């Protein structure tokens, strides 16, 4: 297999989301499609595509309205937006970002972080 046909050698291992509402944030993370690996009272671990782990970490106070330190990507942005709306997650309207050839929407998770969801930008090569 040529180098361009192989999976990249690196991946994102962990992303962290601090929360002061562990149970509600855990329900949210499961609802948006992450797989529970471990759920505890102070730390919970969820697996996303590619093996990246999203860690929920309990914190006494969280600044509501702050953007999450990461964003997420989905294969079908419109279907995901519709599903999130049906779950009562109140996604923002989908908007185009022509400078980067993407569409996005945001959702506020229970602790108040705003998470941006992007249309897929995968190259079509193994990942």
Where are the regions a protein language model picked out?
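Core segments of cupin and vicinal oxygen chelate
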Residues: 9-10, 16-53
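Short beta->alpha connector loops
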Residues: 40-41, 76, 97-98
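Conserved short beta-strand elements that form part of the metal-binding/catalytic scaffold
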Residues: 35-68, 114-120
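Vicinal oxygen chelate
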Residues: 1-8, 11-20, 61-127
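Structural preference for long, well-ordered alpha-helical segments within the folded cores
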Residues: 27-31, 83, 111
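A generic local structural motif
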Residues: 2-4, 32, 56-59, 92
